């Protein structure tokens, strides 16, 4: 069974980036407990790229069904509405990638 990499991208106007970044930082407290308890979670990252005025949530799951739990995770849905109300746009659909290969650091470096 191959793991799934889920990627969600938010874009905003450059003058709203700082506010959106702070909202994303604050979102961790709301989202972390529920996400950590989800079946199949392997890793979760929130990130920001000021150069493109974008924020991302990238996660790795054991399978597609596990990744799709995020589609109905109410705290995430609610926060998405808050971001949208502040002018954010989301790339849709959210992408769920079946992994083709992976790399890990070599233990012999």
Name the predicted role of every residue range.
Residues 77-81:
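A common structural junction motif
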Residues 1-56, 62-75, 85-109:
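Short S/T/G/P-rich N-terminal loop/turn motif that feeds into the first structured element of a domain
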